[in-house]
Each structure stands twice: as C-alpha cells, then as structure tokens.
C-alpha cells in the first residue's frame, strides 16, 4: 500500500524529499516547539484542524516507537543487533517523524499555502544548476505573508463596474413600505 501522509494537505513525500535530512530540527526541538505553541489545542478534546490531528498522531506514533526502542534495548542481548535497531529507528523512522512534525508545525505557524510555496520554491532552487541559481536557498520565514499559489484552470472573470445612470429630473415614485422591512 502506497500511503502519502501529505496528500490531503496538498503536498507529497516527494516534495518534502527535496529538503536535506539535516534541514529538519531534532525531534526533541520539534516536540518542544509544538508543545510551546500548540499544547492547549493538542490536549483539547475538541477538533481544531486536520494539522492538529496529524500532529497528535505523529507525537503518539513517536511515543510508541520510543516504547518499542526501549523494550528492544532492554531485551536484545546482542549489542551489535541492538545498535542496528537503534540506528535504523533514528535514521529512517526518525527522519520521517521529523518531516511530519516539521510540516504540520510549520503549516500551523506560517499557513499551509506559505509552506507549500516554500517547498516548491526550494525544490526549484535545489534542482537549478548552481551556476544559475542564487547562492542562498529560500527561507520559510522570509516568504511574503501574501504569497498566492495560483490554481490551474480559468481565472475568475472580473466584473467591471457599470457606468452610473443619469438621474432624471422628474421626481421618483416611492416604493411601498412593505419592501423596506424585508432583508
């Protein structure tokens, strides 16, 4: 089964893969940030947003993974095997959790559209040969807040204001009072 945890948010695993693994903060830093900014919403029984829900799930998943790692660490006798398991969890699963946490914390902090625009900008920047790209990569916090991601398809037709009609010099008849009471 090929499940992309970013699909419903307009992103993809491939889009996040353009960011190097050392781009993402440590899980501890991401958990501290999520807790500092969104603790009340994350602990609330109310539904806040799909990003809050996804963040809750990623945090719970990481907690369960740490429980498993602790169990493996205390029950696996062979130090080499234990090191392999710990390394695999930290490198592979840790990166996926760091990406998930970063994505959802960033979407809650900067807005989904801004994060998507950043991912696209970074993807374009990293794929451009070094000789033709600016020396510095785009930075999420410096993107303009009014970034607009244009959707494909026809743009909405703009209505031009109609010209004002000339008022006649003759007095107008009053409409009945019953019309004014309607909303």
UniProtKB/Swiss-Prot annotation:
Chief location category: virion
Q: Where is this region: 3 X 8 AA repeats of S-P-R-R-R-[PR]-S-Q?
A: 155-177
Annotated family: Belongs to the orthohepadnavirus core antigen family.
Keywords recorded for this protein, A-Z: Capsid protein, Cytoplasmic inwards viral transport, DNA-binding, Host cytoplasm, Host-virus interaction, Microtubular inwards viral transport, Phosphoprotein, Repeat, RNA-binding, T=4 icosahedral capsid protein, Viral penetration into host nucleus, Virion, Virus entry into host cell
InterPro entries (UniProt xref): Hepatitis_core, Viral_capsid_core_dom_sf_HBV
What GO CC annotations are associated with the protein? host cell; host cell cytoplasm; T=4 icosahedral viral capsid
Q: Tell me where in or outside the cell this protein is found.
A: Virion; Host cytoplasm
One Pfam family it belongs to: Hepatitis_core
On this chain, the residues bearing Phosphoserine are 155, 162, 170
sequence-type repeats, residues: 155-161, 162-169, 170-177
Q: Which domain of life is it from?
A: Viruses
Q: Note down the stretches annotated as region RNA binding.
A: 177-183
The GO terms this record gives for MF are: DNA binding; RNA binding; structural molecule activity
The protein, known as: Capsid protein
């Amino acid at each position: 089964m090929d499940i992309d945890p970013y699909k419903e948010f307009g992103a993809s695993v491939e889009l996040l893969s353009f960011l190097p693994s050392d781009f993402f903060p440590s899980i501890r830093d991401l958990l501290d940030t999520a807790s500092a900014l969104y603790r009340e919403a994350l602990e609330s029984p109310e539904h806040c947003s799909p990003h809050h829900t996804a963040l809750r799930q990623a945090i719970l998943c990481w907690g369960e993974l740490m429980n498993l790692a602790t169990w493996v660490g205390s029950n696996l006798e062979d130090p080499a095997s234990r090191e392999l398991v710990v390394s695999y969890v930290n490198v592979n699963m840790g990166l996926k959790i760091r990406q998930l946490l970063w994505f959802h914390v960033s979407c809650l902090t900067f807005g989904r559209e801004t994060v998507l625009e950043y991912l696209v900008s970074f993807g374009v920047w990293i794929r451009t040969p070094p000789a033709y790209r600016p020396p510095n990569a785009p930075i999420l916090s410096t993107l303009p807040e009014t970034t607009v991601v244009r959707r494909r398809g026809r743009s909405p037709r703009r209505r031009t204001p109609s010209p004002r009609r000339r008022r006649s010099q003759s007095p107008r008849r009053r409409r009945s009072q019953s019309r004014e009471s309607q909303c």
